[in-house]
């Protein structure tokens, strides 16, 4: 199991990237292979990201995934094939334990970053918990989300900046 310490060994920089949602094994393996070649060449630690299910679609008939267990097994295969950690989003407390059986990092989507039950369930798996900052929050307010995970017994917390929304759909990001 990877730890926050493992990721910190990379001088505080690593790449977390992959498809928005797992659409199939071949696609996921092809993406991982390509990114692993690049990150190996550049000596950048890599974490493969892919949602096993996208619960936050605009339309009811939008594609949400290939099935939970099938997609989670694809993520596990990516990890084993390329020896990289994997991360996936979870959207409810009930998903935490199931997803934790297959992945190294549980990611909390930005719009769910204040959901106490979800944060506590993710924390209780013992996995790293990556909380994406809600665009409606100040960076300082994310401390409360992180504190919930730590207070639930898990100090392996990452925070991901997602920008801040001003007005209606006017998203500002920090450019690095």
Positions of the model-derived regions?
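Glycine-rich, proline-tolerant flexible connector loops at the mouths of alpha/beta enzymes
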Residues: 19-27, 47-68
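N-terminal amphipathic alpha-helix/helix-capping segment at the start of soluble metabolic enzymes
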Residues: 1-15
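Conserved small/polar residues in nucleotide/adenosyl-binding loops
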Residues: 48, 174-176
């Amino acid at each position: 199991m990877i730890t926050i310490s493992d990721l910190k060994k990379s001088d505080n920089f690593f790449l977390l990237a992959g498809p928005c949602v797992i659409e199939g094994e071949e696609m996921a393996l092809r993406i991982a292979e390509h990114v692993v070649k690049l990150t190996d060449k550049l000596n950048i630690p890599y974490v493969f990201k892919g949602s096993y299910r996208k619960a936050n679609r605009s339309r009811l008939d939008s594609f949400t995934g290939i099935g939970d267990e099938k997609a989670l097994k694809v993520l596990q295969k990516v990890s084993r094939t390329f020896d990289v950690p994997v991360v996936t989003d979870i959207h409810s407390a009930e998903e935490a334990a199931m997803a934790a059986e297959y992945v190294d990092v549980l990611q909390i989507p930005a719009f769910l970053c204040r959901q106490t039950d979800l944060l506590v369930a993710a924390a209780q798996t013992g996995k790293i918990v990556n909380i994406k900052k809600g665009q409606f929050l100040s960076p300082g307010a994310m401390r409360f989300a992180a504190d919930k995970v730590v207070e639930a017994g898990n100090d392996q917390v990452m925070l991901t900046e997602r920008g801040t929304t001003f007005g209606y759909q006017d998203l500002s990001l920090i450019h690095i």
